[in-house]
């Protein structure tokens, strides 16, 4: 066992804190590098290995950047509002505020034990009034700009959590928090108009250095569709409805239309003889989530309304059906069905024996979903693709029955929550004045402590008289506060703006400072946030820009998703499975640097993998070996009279590995390829060991230069251990104030190389040659090799092919 332990961790953590080593320099913003990991939610009592996998390697990357000369800003905080703390309180009786702050205290201690260079003086905690005051300010600014509004709407309702869920929080028809089946409910809710920014949210994506999969997920979620809106009149009625389609060229093939069960027209056009069946179907559909209804694997169902619509392009009557696979929240809540050219429509038509009429040429069988020439389409026969679409739209426009239209899958962001542990919405309701904003000077609207928050489907704050009853700021009369709280994603949608200016009591942030500090240069967190937090933060940034507070378009220039650390059994860690990995025990046994290095070497950072106790022990042995080698090197330097100053073969060999390591590690760590970086360090370690173990006289000054570079390269990955080794070689300043080494291209040019010699295509020997050797000299060396002579024997040499510095192939018969 070596000397490295948690005592060394504690020693250097204390020194770093005493010397304010990582304090951000606000006077040097030209070289600023804003590095941010998604902050932790303090729902559990402690950080687990997954948190470390997010924070530890990113800290190593930030240290590397600091040594490259960047002024690194790396803050930390806690996303502290939300359902888990409230559910825990209901279960245990411990108040959310008490459990949250206790957990934060524990996690702060753990994060400091990691040795990360977080700027703790910039910490934010979203459940603190000095933070959510400005979350409320943000809501009011959005409200003033018409980007926040309240309306009655069908919402996702979790009967277990007793609260509304955003579409993004429903996974396969179940609540992402408690896995309960999600219902539908009509409630007055607050929304943010993210749809106003749909186009820009799409357009700017391609400019970002983000994973392609994440950009694709956001594009799909926004779901821009370019098509046409077509008007269908209801037969024998003055009713009409519009449908959106991207394939208006198939309009002649419409054989039925389908309305969502929630569509307001359903009751009006359902005939008396079909009413009972339609009502029963509506009730059934109400219990299905939007995601379930849209599932491609689920069999489509529907009922006939009894009414017919008129196809505007050919005047044919088509039946109007009610189907739950149509969503009232998407498009117009009505779709035209072309079973010959749409798989879903084809399956529905086949099931209910509805007509199927080909109107696009192509394919041996139906449905044919590709583009082709229009057929059975009257005057439009023979037209193809965009020309066909334009011609049909032009005809519809001339009849005032259609127009070009762009549609989006994206819905406005529902932010109301009927729960306690969240930021109160700063709105007051007065019988005389109506809806009134809480004046800025009265913020924050503080969350009261003594509240009965057992879930009953109603907002807990509505049951707290001291909170709910207030005075109207306009007329001074009696009024009521908004009882709902804000979705916790509102709190996290802007936290990156607060970090650099977290003690500002007058404003959410100082625009002059923030516009120099932002955007975030490197953002790291899980891919599960692609269509929620990451999208919301982009929206809020653009909204604040348009209000004049920000001069940039995007919050996060570069994004990396870390992988998932699984339990030793290869399954996702969970307390119920008993496969969680607590960092504390391993740090106590091995030290923080061994734990950190294992996470970086044992896994591809963007993929993760299963935990292995054997693998972390191997890293512990590697650190012990490095310690012994560096101790031997120090002794060699100390005892040497430095009577050798030449760079002979052994020195050149080590120097090659040294500079190859500098080059490779610099490139790999920059791309967060930590595992290959540490592999290069291991190669450098082997080269040092070989040099120290050789029998020849050693160059002490060269050896010192080599171990200085080695420790410098090691520093981001093992910060405490590297500082200790740095001190032991007699350097008093912190290694993290050192400049990152640069490789010498000349050192990568070898005097000698080993090449293979083949006889008739099979390798028979390897020889060392000078890189400056001529082709004839290489041939001579190969032919004079004893193994080659034996291999050729009595055969006649027909040809000798030389690929310089790589290969010799001898053809002999």
UniProtKB/Swiss-Prot annotation:
Main location: cytoplasm
HAMAP family, per database record: Leu_tRNA_synth_B (MF_00049_B)
Tree of life domain: Bacteria
UniProt record similarity statement: Belongs to the class-I aminoacyl-tRNA synthetase family.
Binding site for ATP: 575
One GO location term (cellular component): cytosol
Organism (species): Clostridium botulinum (strain Langeland / NCTC 10281 / Type F)
Residue span of motif 'HIGH' region: 40-51
Name recorded for this polypeptide: Leucine--tRNA ligase
Pfam short name (any one): tRNA-synt_1g
Entry's localization field: Cytoplasm
UniProt record, GO biological process: leucyl-tRNA aminoacylation
Enzyme class at the top of the EC tree: ligase
Enzyme Commission code(s) on record: 6.1.1.4
NCBIfam families the UniProt entry points to: leuS_bact (TIGR00396)
Record GO terms (molecular function): aminoacyl-tRNA deacylase activity; ATP binding; leucine-tRNA ligase activity
Catalytic activity as recorded in UniProt: tRNA(Leu) + L-leucine + ATP = L-leucyl-tRNA(Leu) + AMP + diphosphate
Motif ('KMSKS' region): 572-576
């Amino acid at each position: 066992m070596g000397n490295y332990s948690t005592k060394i961790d504690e020693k250097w953590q204390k020194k770093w804190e005493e010397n304010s080593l990582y304090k951000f320099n606000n006077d040097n913003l030209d070289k600023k590098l804003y590095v941010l990991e998604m902050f932790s939610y303090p729902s559990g009592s402690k950080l687990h290995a997954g948190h470390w996998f997010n924070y530890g390697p990113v800290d190593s990357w930030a240290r590397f950047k600091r040594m490259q000369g960047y002024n690194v800003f790396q803050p930390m905080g806690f996303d502290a509002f939300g359902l888990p703390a409230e559910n825990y309180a209901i279960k245990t009786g411990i108040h959310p505020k008490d459990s949250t702050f206790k957990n934060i205290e524990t996690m702060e201690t753990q994060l400091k034990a990691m040795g990360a260079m977080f700027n703790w003086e910039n910490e934010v905690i979203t459940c603190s009034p000095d933070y959510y005051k400005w979350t409320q300010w943000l809501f009011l600014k959005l409200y003033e700009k018409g980007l926040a509004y309240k309306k009655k709407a069908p919402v996702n309702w979790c009967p277990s959590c007793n609260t509304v869920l955003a579409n993004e929080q429903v996974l396969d028809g179940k609540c992402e928090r408690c896995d309960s089946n999600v219902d539908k409910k009509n409630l007055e809710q607050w929304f943010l108009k993210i749809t106003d920014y749909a186009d820009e949210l799409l357009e700017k994506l391609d400019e970002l250095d983000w994973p392609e999969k994440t950009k694709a997920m956001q594009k799909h979620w926004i779901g821009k569709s370019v098509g046409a809106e077509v008007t269908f009149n209801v037969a024998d009625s003055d009713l009409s409805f519009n449908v959106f389609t991207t394939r208006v060229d198939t309009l002649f093939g419409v054989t039925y239309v389908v309305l969502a069960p929630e569509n307001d027209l359903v009751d009006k056009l359902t005939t008396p003889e079909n009413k009972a069946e339609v009502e029963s179907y509506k009730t059934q559909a109400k219990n299905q989530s939007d995601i379930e209804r849209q599932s491609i694997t689920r069999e489509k169902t529907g009922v006939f309304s009894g009414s017919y619509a008129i196809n505007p392009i050919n005047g044919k009557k088509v039946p109007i059906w009610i189907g739950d696979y149509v969503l009232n929240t998407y498009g117009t809540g009505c779709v035209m069905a072309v079973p010959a050219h749409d798989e879903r429509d084809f399956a529905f038509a086949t099931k209910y024996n509805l007509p199927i009429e080909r109107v696009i040429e192509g394919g041996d069988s139906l449905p044919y979903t590709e583009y082709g020439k229009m057929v059975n389409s009257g005057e439009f026969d023979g037209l193809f693709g965009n020309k066909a679409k334009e011609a049909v739209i032009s005809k519809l426009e001339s009849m005032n029955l259609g127009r070009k239209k762009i549609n989006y899958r994206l819905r406005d962001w529902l932010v109301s929550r009927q729960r306690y542990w969240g930021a109160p919405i700063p709105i007051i309701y007065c019988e005389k004045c109506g809806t009134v904003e809480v004046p800025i000077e009265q913020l924050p609207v503080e969350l009261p402590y003594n509240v009965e928050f057992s879930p009953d489907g109603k907002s807990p704050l509505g049951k707290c008289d001291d909170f709910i009853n207030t005075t109207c700021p306009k007329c001074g009369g009696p009024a009521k506060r908004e009882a709902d709280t804000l979705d916790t994603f509102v709190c996290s949608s802007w936290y990156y703006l607060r970090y650099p200016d977290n003690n500002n009591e007058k404003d959410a942030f100082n625009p002059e400072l923030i516009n120099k500090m932002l955007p975030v240069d490197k953002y790291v967190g899980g891919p599960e946030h692609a269509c929620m937090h990451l999208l919301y933060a982009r929206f809020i940034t653009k909204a604040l820009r348009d209000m004049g507070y920000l001069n940039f378009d995007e919050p996060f220039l570069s994004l990396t998703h870390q992988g998932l650390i699984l339990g030793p059994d290869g399954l996702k860690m969970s307390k119920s499975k008993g496969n969680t990995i607590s960092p504390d025990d391993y740090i106590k046994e091995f030290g923080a640097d061994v734990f950190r290095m294992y996470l970086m070497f044992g896994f591809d950072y963007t993929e993760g993998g299963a935990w292995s106790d054997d693998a972390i022990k191997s890293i512990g042995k590697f650190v012990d070996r490095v310690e012994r080698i560096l101790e031997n090197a120090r002794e060699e330097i100390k005892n040497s009279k430095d009577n050798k100053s030449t760079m002979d073969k052994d020195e050149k060999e080590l120097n090659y590995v040294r500079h190859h390591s500098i080059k490779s590690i610099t490139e790999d760590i920059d791309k967060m390829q930590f595992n290959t970086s540490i592999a290069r360090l291991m190669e450098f370690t082997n080269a040092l060991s070989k040099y120290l173990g050789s029998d020849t006289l050693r160059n002490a000054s060269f050896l010192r230069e080599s171990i200085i570079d080695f420790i410098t390269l090691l520093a981001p990955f093992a910060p405490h251990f590297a500082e200790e080794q740095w001190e032991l070689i007699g350097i008093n300043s912190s290694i993290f104030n050192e400049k990152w080494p640069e490789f010498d291209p000349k050192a990568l040019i070898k005097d000698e190389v080993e090449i293979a010699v083949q006889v008739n295509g099979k390798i028979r020997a390897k020889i060392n040659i000078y890189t400056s050797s001529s082709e004839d000299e290489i041939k001579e060396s190969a032919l004079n090799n004893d193994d080659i002579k034996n291999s050729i024997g009595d055969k006649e040499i027909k040809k000798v092919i030389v690929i310089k510095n790589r290969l010799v192939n001898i053809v002999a018969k």
